[in-house]
């Protein structure tokens, strides 16, 4: 639904607001007949997971210095986290075929948030490796469960819009993560973003 308006003269220029949509109406158009609330929750989970990953990437030099790591040690940590995420994705995808995907998504979000928070409390390299590997649960749960939930909830004719909106969360998280992480780390230290995100 568009806002009806007449062209207006502003500063010598004609403007027309007839193409401006209310944000809720735009979201409703994306969701179509599917559950808007569910789509927004999955969008939020996807964005926050990306915030965490991009925060770790932007704060890697501070983390490296805190734990006296070289570049090789830091890259080993990052590769270990990626390998754990890949291994977990296969296991979680199998679980999602047999069990409630909503419950798996909730459990994954809770586990991810606990591990992400604990990243800010890490006192040793081994502990940091364990909690960062545990935080890989977020990505491992998001891909198999979110995709199948969206496919179940939305009809084929609206899936392109829905999946595009859901994937936009990655760009939102990747864009806002470094910004917020940088500001928080500058003010409070590298641990703060993980305690807040």
Spans of model-derived segments:
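Extracytoplasmic
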Residues: 38-69
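Extracellular/periplasmic helix-loop-helix junction of adjacent transmembrane segments
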Residues: 59-86
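Helix-breaking motifs and short loop linkers at transmembrane-helix boundaries and internal kinks
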Residues: 68, 100, 121-127, 138, ...
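Conserved MFS/SLC helix-loop-helix module at the cytosolic interface between two early adjacent transmembrane helices
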Residues: 87-123
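Helix-loop-helix hairpin linking two adjacent transmembrane segments in secondary transporters
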Residues: 166, 170-197
